């Protein structure tokens, strides 16, 4: 896994990103694995709870599908793509702190079968563009 650092934040180069600090890893069968970025988890600090997306729910790109709760704040989880939620990371219900420890790996949040991938993929940010966003914000 190649990574780039922006100050104390890590951005991996093997995935795409959103303006709302989610990451997306796409597979050949249009299934996307989605989580929140290192930048997002460090801003939230100690994550204490999560409301996971509803399995088999059809969602639109940009729709709020869940909530992450930290000692400091609550933040919506947005779906970066339209499609159907096919899997959620139930481990996070008992151990939401995994997101703090490993946001890009064990801390993945949900998987989605994308329905409009070709048109929506263009709206996602490359690692370089996401770094520009972090530097600007």
Swiss-Prot record:
Which InterPro entries does the UniProt entry name for this protein?
Biotin_lipoyl, GCV_H, GCV_H/Fam206, GCV_H_sub, Single_hybrid_motif
Q: Does the keyword tRNA processing apply?
A: no
How many cofactors are bound and how?
A: Binds 1 lipoyl cofactor covalently.
One matching Pfam family: GCV_H
Record Gene3D superfamilies: 2.40.50.100
Per the entry, which co-factors are needed? (R)-lipoate
For this UniProt record, the keywords arranged alphabetically read as follows: Lipoyl
Q: In its UniProt entry, what is this protein called?
A: Probable glycine cleavage system H protein 1
Q: Which organism is it from?
A: Saccharolobus solfataricus (strain ATCC 35092 / DSM 1617 / JCM 11322 / P2)
This chain is encoded by the gene named gcvH1
